[in-house]
């Protein structure tokens, strides 16, 4: 019987997982998706403002990973509404490995 390969326990170590790079890649994808919209809900307008800061945060400000992980529900909802399978896959991997 074939058993699926076990996924490593993400809580053992975050070493060698490029969480910051994955978050920046997803953030860029989100920005492109949102900027293509004719009108944006106030939530996404504020999100884009925070995203600009999150790319180069100062001490005490949220970085890209924190911004994405703290808004994962809304991001998944956006990708589902847009039928963006690539975005959903990136978000799923980031959430599983890093959030």
Curated annotation (Swiss-Prot):
Q: Transferase among the record's keywords? A: no
Question: What keywords tag this UniProt record?
Answer: Nitrogen fixation
Q: Could you tell me which InterPro entries the record lists for this protein?
A: CowN (IPR024899)
One of the Pfam families matching this protein, by short name:
CowN
User: Is Ion transport set as a keyword in this record?
Assistant: no
Q: Name one GO biological process term.
A: nitrogen fixation
Q: What does this protein do?
A: Is required to sustain N(2)-dependent growth in the presence of low levels of carbon monoxide (CO). Probably acts by protecting the N(2) fixation ability of the nitrogenase complex, which is inactivated in the presence of CO.
Family membership noted in the UniProt record = Belongs to the CowN family.
Q: What is this protein called?
A: N(2)-fixation sustaining protein CowN
Species of provenance: Magnetococcus marinus (strain ATCC BAA-1437 / JCM 17883 / MC-1)
């Amino acid at each position: 019987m074939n058993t699926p390969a076990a996924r490593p326990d993400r809580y053992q170590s975050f070493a060698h997982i490029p969480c910051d790079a994955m978050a920046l890649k997803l953030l860029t994808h989100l920005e492109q998706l949102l900027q293509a919209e004719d009108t944006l809900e106030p939530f996404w307008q504020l999100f884009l403002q925070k995203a600009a800061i999150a790319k180069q945060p100062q001490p005490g400000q949220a970085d890209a990973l924190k911004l994405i992980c703290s808004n994962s529900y809304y991001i998944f909802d956006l990708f589902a509404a847009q039928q963006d399978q690539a975005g959903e896959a990136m978000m799923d991997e980031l959430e599983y490995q890093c959030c």
